[in-house]
Swiss-Prot record:
InterPro entries: CK1_Ser-Thr_kinase, Kinase-like_dom_sf, Prot_kinase_dom, Protein_kinase_ATP_BS, TTBK_Asator-like_STKc. The gene is Asator. It comes from Drosophila melanogaster. Disruption phenotype: Embryonic lethal. Residues 13-35, 662-724, 755-792, 984-1003 are annotated as: Disordered. The active site is at 293 (proton acceptor). GO terms for biological process: signal transduction. This is Tau-tubulin kinase homolog Asator. Residues 20-35, 755-776 have a biased composition (Polar residues). It comes from the Eukaryota. Detected in larval brain. It is an enzyme of class 2 (transferase). Pfam families: Pkinase. It is found in: Cytoplasm, Cytoskeleton, Spindle; Cytoplasm. Interacts with Mgtor.
Length: 1262
């Protein structure tokens, strides 16, 4: 795989002439040995590490050469020739460059350099290759083979990770970086794409024999709601791995202890920690589980302001349930095996006995001793059995020497317990509280890691020496530090060597009047004195935004970039290569006067903030003004404001641009530093607790007040363009002056991956403080200069940052657990206990590539504020989208709760309406004064349900109660109900105006809903005589429709379960009169379905229609079909709420059901057998039912046609519809109970059968 290259001028050759004849000064001894006569080219290609996938192409050839060396010395010449041939084949134009490769698993951390041939596109092949000595390839092959093997192993480790940065688990959790790994799985920091909070993903391979996440999930779920247990978010599994997602925590107690000056906690901190751990142990015991791996690294503090003083229990992989299903203690096993960590394990665990509740308390006791004393007597012992013997023989009362005497009672209590005994938690908790009360310890007192060691700061200020030998390694003067905002980008840990273990590198507070150098990119950097000695870190003051190669022995170069775009490309491409012996700090002028960036071997920067939790002021700064990210500290702010203005002036910037390079040796740098110190006054920082600040308090601009209209043609020389400027600013300091995203026209560029100098992987602070790039715009679009404030849900506040601490003890059965805890910034060790020659050996993490910059953009997309308005009119920042200006927000589709036309005009109503209509409550009356859209209606045929959408209550009404109905023409009513033979009669051909025809066509085209006031018709008067009957008998019947498949041969009339819906009706007058041809007619009426008349005809009206006595079967069919047509016509009139259609029925036209033609020459329907449920049935079809016990006189009749005697004609069928007084059918006299019918039968019966039967009666009597 080709190695990634970046075309930038070489820093080492910045001042060299263009002819390339002068030789470059080597950056290290190894480099000088490898290429003593290396010529300088005008444009050298900087080599960076590749993505962790495959070794470089030439490594294979180098390995082949090495093998040939071992096989035959005579093959060396041929191997060199083959190697050159391979190089020429792969790279037509090559340059030879040496690069530093990480030495994986090298305990001393030595980093070697190896020479590779890399392509060059701007130089001829013969020129570039002719400058290189031929024998250097063999030198590279000899010296680089061992390094490449280790690089290969590093690549292998990374490629075998279960997850990679950028992966999304379950379409919800995006992997940010790996923060731990071991024999039981891997731990990643991730981001919840829904809530935007940082989470921890614990992953184990599905193929490993020992599955522990199942127990982890079980215990974690049981413990939810407990005070000292982190929140469980989710879990799952696939064919590759199992995973559990939980709340991300901060530093563990092992790291916090080692960060202290003497490696121990004060008694005040120890007592309060012991009390919290005791309560956590009691909580897990209360749910029936033992932890069995109590140790400092399995307890961490929270990382948010509200929980940063709370201790959380982690890692339940070794937990065991000690109770049975009934709550009794399980019987102990004879040989249970060792579980836990050797240093903190109880004597029972060393004896392989079954562990009980008291064994967790033994581990707590050992933790308390280590907290106060700094170590345990058996710390140096490596053998587990030897540690167990030591614990048995050791007088534990000696361990209480520096502990309160009251804790002797704690020791005596746990010594008296056995496996099945329950500890007296209340007594032990009271013991700790009594000790705290006697010593005046308050819960609000600051913990040791929250304090500032003023003595250490004074020593730093007095000496100005960046390295002071102190016991703990990589601590910073016992100073609480602010978390780096952008330090979560990559996962490579800093590798310490043995020479650094006993030396603490404490960064000094710079003199206030040190003059910064301003390079051509307007990045102010200050000079400092480099450290002496090969093993000590050297403070380099280069350009923080340029990730340059810096030589190891005192050479300090300023990067000379031709334009700003090259600088940005340099940042984005790859990390720089640095010597292993160097720890390079770059002064951060913009953030605070005590902030340094550590340039790590992979080019990442560590923010070392001396004054932790400093409150940064927010100041609005106009464009072309000075930087705004300043510490609000007395004496510092005014000085730096003037300094920044001075050094960011165009004159100085132009001078810097004219320079081709700056080379400073040790002596010059030291003299300059001493000169500045004579004139300097040292500022001491006051550490304050960072207030939990809400993003709602921030200005809408989010600190980015620069309005950039032309990105490409205008560059602001006054704005701070350093990427390193805001990385240490917490949520309390969200004002940045860094506008590089807009100034350089690369709005989508994320910040540089940064890490603390303690080599800890710290997650970003919640606001990422509006992120470095202004607006987080995507695609290079011009933002409006303001960043959407992050919601409080996504506000992650990281308050503390501490020195690098390793968990030197590995739990049993956990080969490499790295502490096994979901600690955010922890490193986990791989050795069993302490190493042979040092007590602080560490686990070397695999080299991980910096994640893609495009993926980083999506990490910290700001969420919109949770405004009170549910539908803001302005644009809402979506994931990866630019905030739309108000003009563009109008084109965005609006969000509706319910699809109601015009609801957007009712702001208050829109908030209260539900998301959907689901099972509304049926009532009798609605609130008065409701108007649309507060009231909606759903129409089902002639029944309308009016609904109060705010309260989800509806009432059932008929069409006539809510609509304005016109007086129907008698001719239209008649024509809609007469068969076609009658329509042809000239006496029935009444005049029908074109207006009525147009209205009828319009009505037929309307949907099946009730519409108000479509025509300007007069409201019909309701029949007051029938109103009482309607109100008395109109009721809602609930039920359900059941459809069953039944065999065809079960149509026996005596069947008690199934009834023939079209069965014969006996004893009716029609059947008695015409037995020869009445079957076809009466088949349309079933006596089972007869009901009290819904529509009853009076005697005088029925007698007005004369029918020939000698009618045939066809006429009987016609009469039966006429009933169906009549029902259809009535249905039309009801469902639309106006007059019935007045159109003449033509051939081929359909009625309201779309089935029956008006020319009634069609066969009768086949009988359908539908089961009848002896229960209530629904009236969804819209028919109005009454009980069978009611008299026929109280039957409900239609109200739309009032009685007008003066308009009666000879051919008027439906002139008046009074209450029916007499019956003409035996079936109608004894109707069945409507409640016995299914909804389908109810609909068929009420709308078809009854009108059909009535009309047949009409024909019979006539």
């Amino acid at each position: 795989m080709f190695w990634h290259l970046l075309c930038v001028p070489n820093d080492e050759n910045a001042s060299a002439p263009d002819d390339g004849n002068q030789s470059c000064q080597p950056s290290s001894k190894q480099d000088q040995y490898l290429s003593p006569n290396r010529n300088c080219q005008k444009n050298l290609l900087r080599l960076y590490p590749p993505p962790p996938s495959k070794p470089p192409p030439l490594v294979g050839a180098i390995l082949q050469t090495r093998l040939l060396h071992q096989i035959s010395p005579s093959a060396i010449a041929d191997a060199d020739a083959d190697l050159n041939a391979v190089g020429e084949l792969l790279y037509p134009n090559v340059l030879q460059r040496s690069a530093t490769l990480p030495a994986k698993h090298n305990r001393l951390g030595v980093r070697s350099r190896v020479t590779f041939k890399v392509p060059s596109s701007n130089l001829p092949a013969q020129d570039s290759y002719s400058h290189q000595p031929r024998n250097q390839v063999a030198v590279a092959a000899k010296d680089g083979i061992l390094v490449d093997v280790k690089a290969k192993e590093s690549v292998k480790m990374t490629s075998e990770d279960l997850l990679q940065p950028g992966h999304v688990v379950k379409e919800r959790w995006k992997v940010v970086r790996k923060i731990g790994g071991g024999g039981f799985g891997e731990i990643y920091e991730g981001q919840d794409l829904i809530t935007r909070e940082q989470v921890a993903l614990k992953v184990e391979s599905a193929r490993q024999p020992k599955q522990v996440l199942k127990m982890e999930v079980a215990v974690l779920k049981k413990l939810q709601g407990k005070e000292h247990v982190c929140r469980f978010i989710g879990c799952g599994r696939n064919d590759r791995f199992n995973y559990v997602v939980m709340q991300l925590q901060g530093k563990n107690l092992a790291e916090l202890r080692r960060a202290q000056p003497r490696g121990a906690f004060s008694l005040s901190t120890t007592l309060r920690l012991g009390l919290q751990i005791l309560k956590a142990i009691e909580s897990i015991h209360s749910v029936g589980f033992l932890h069995r791996d109590i140790k400092p690294s399995n307890f961490s503090v929270g990382r948010l302001p509200y929980n940063c003083r709370r201790v959380y229990m982690l890692d339940f992989g070794l937990a065991r349930q000690y109770t049975t299903g009934t709550g009794e203690v399980r019987c102990p096993r004879a040989a249970a095996g060792f579980r836990g960590t050797v240093r903190y394990a109880s004597i029972n665990a060393h004896r392989n006995r079954e562990m009980g509740r008291h064994d967790d308390l033994w581990s707590l006791f050992y933790m308390l001793v280590e907290f106060v004393n700094g170590q345990l007597p058996w710390r140096k012992i490596k053998d587990k059995e030897q540690v167990g013997l030591t614990k048995e023989k050791y007088d534990h009362r000696i361990l209480l020497k520096h502990l309160p005497s009251d804790l002797k009672q704690f020791l005596e209590h746990i010594q008296s317990l056995t496996y099945g005994d329950r500890p007296d938690y209340a007594m032990l908790i009271g013991l700790f509280e009594r000790c705290m009360k006697r010593r005046g310890v308050k819960e609000s007192d600051p913990y040791d890691w929250e304090k500032v060691d003023s003595t250490a700061i004074g020593n730093i200020s007095a000496t100005g020496n960046p390295s002071i030998p102190i016991k703990s390694d990589y601590m910073h003067g016992n100073i609480t530090q602010m978390t780096v905002a952008a330090s979560n980008a990559s996962g490579t840990e800093y590798i310490r060597k043995r020479a650094e273990i006993e030396t603490a590198h404490i960064t000094a507070t710079d003199p206030l009047n040190i003059k910064e150098k301003v390079d051509k990119n307007c990045n102010a950097t200050s000079l400092a004195q480099p450290a002496k000695g090969s093993g000590e870190p050297m403070v380099q003051h280069g350009n923080a935004a340029n990730n340059q190669n810096i030589t190891s022995k005192g050479l300090q170069q300023q990067s000379t970039l031709t334009n700003s775009q090259v600088a940005i490309a340099n940042i984005q491409s790859a990390p720089s290569m640095i010597e292993r012996e160097d720890v390079q700090y770059t002064k951060l002028e913009e953030g605070a006067p005590t902030k340094f960036i550590t340039m790590k071997p992979n080019g990442e920067c560590d923010n070392v903030d001396i004054a932790a939790k400093c409150i940064f002021e927010q100041k609005h700064v106009e464009a072309n003004d000075d930087i705004v990210g300043r510490a609000s500290l007395s004496g510092v702010e005014q000085h730096y404001k003037s300094q920044i203005k001075k050094h960011n002036s165009p004159e100085i910037a132009n001078k810097q641009i004219q320079r081709t390079g700056t080379v400073t040796n040790d002596k010059t740098s030291e003299v300059n530093r001493s000169t500045e110190e004579q004139k300097s006054t040292f500022g001491r920082l006051r550490v304050l607790t960072a207030p939990p600040m809400s993003v709602h308090d921030l200005p809408s601009g989010g600190g980015h007040s620069h309005q950039v209209s032309d990105l490409s043609g205008k560059q602001d020389p006054y704005a701070a363009t350093s990427n390193a400027a805001p990385i240490g600013i917490n949520s309390s300091s969200t004002k940045f002056g860094s506008q590089h995203g807009q100034i350089f026209g690369l709005a989508a560029m994320p910040p540089i991956n940064r890490r603390s100098a303690t080599s800890t992987n710290l997650r970003p602070s919640s606001s990422a403080s509006q992120r470095i790039n202004s607006g987080s715009t995507i695609g290079g679009a011009v933002g409006n200069g303001s960043n959407t404030a992050r919601s409080s849900v996504a506000g992650d506040h990281s308050v503390t940052q501490f020195a690098l601490i390793d968990d030197e003890n590995v739990s049993a059965l956990q080969q490499v657990t790295k502490g096994g805890a979901l600690t955010l910034a922890s490193q986990w060790k791989s050795q069993f206990d302490d190493s042979e020659d040092t007590t602080d050996n560490e686990w070397n993490r695999e080299h991980q590539l910096q994640p893609n910059l495009e993926q980083l953009i999506k990490l910290d997309i700001s969420l919109p504020l949770n405004e009170a308005k549910p539908f803001p009119q302005h644009g809402v920042a979506g994931t990866g989208k630019l905030i739309n200006p108000p003009g563009e927000a109008k084109g965005r589709p609006k969000r509706y709760t319910l699809n109601i036309t015009g609801i957007e005009n009712y702001e208050a109503l829109r908030i209260s309406i539900p998301n959907c209509w689901s099972e509304p409550a049926m009532g009798n009356v609605l609130r008065k004064g409701l108007e649309p859209p507060a009231v909606q209606q759903a129409a089902f045929d002639d029944t309308v349900y009016r609904m109060d959408i705010a309260r989800n209550v509806c009432v059932r009404e008929t069409y006539s109660e809510i609509t304005h109905l016109a007086r129907p023409s008698t001719s239209s009513v008649l024509r809609n109900r007469l068969p076609s033979p009658f329509k042809k009669d000239s006496a029935l051909q009444l005049n029908s105006t074109n207006d009525s025809l147009d209205k009828s066509r319009h009505r037929n085209s309307l949907p099946n809903v009730s519409v108000n006031d479509i025509f300007d018709d007069l409201q019909m008067k309701l029949n007051l005589d029938l109103g009482s009957a309607i109100q008395e008998n109109n009721c809602c019947i609930s039920g359900r429709l059941e459809i069953r498949v039944i065999p065809k041969d079960t149509s026996h009339p005596d069947d008690s379960v199934y009834y023939d819906a079209m069965g014969a009706v006996k004893n009716t007058p029609t059947a008695n009169e015409g037995h020869d041809h009445s079957d076809q007619a009466v088949n349309n009426c079933d006596e089972m379905e007869a009901t009290s008349a819904v529509i009853a005809f009076p005697n005088k009206s029925i007698s007005k229609i004369m029918s020939p006595p000698g009618r045939d079967a066809t006429e009987e069919r016609t009469g039966a079909s006429l009933c169906s047509l009549y029902s259809a016509g009535v249905n039309k009139l009801k469902l639309n709420g106006n007059t019935a259609p007045r159109t003449q029925f033509k051939k081929g036209s359909t009625d309201g059901f779309g089935e029956n033609e008006s020319e009634f020459d069609f066969p009768l329907l086949n009988p359908s057998k539908i089961p009848v449920r002896q229960s209530k049935c629904a009236s969804w079809a819209g028919a109005d039912f009454i009980s069978a016990s009611k008299p026929l006189e109280s039957a409900e009749v239609p109200q739309e046609i009032p009685y007008h005697p003066q308009s009666d004609t000879t051919y008027s069928v439906i002139d008046s519809i009074p209450v029916r007084k007499t019956t003409y059918s035996i079936a109608l006299e004894c109707p069945p109970n409507i409640s016995d019918l299914t909804p389908g039968l109810s609909y068929f019966y009420c709308n078809i059968v009854v009108p059909l039967r009535l009309f047949s009666i009409l024909l019979t009597e006539s």
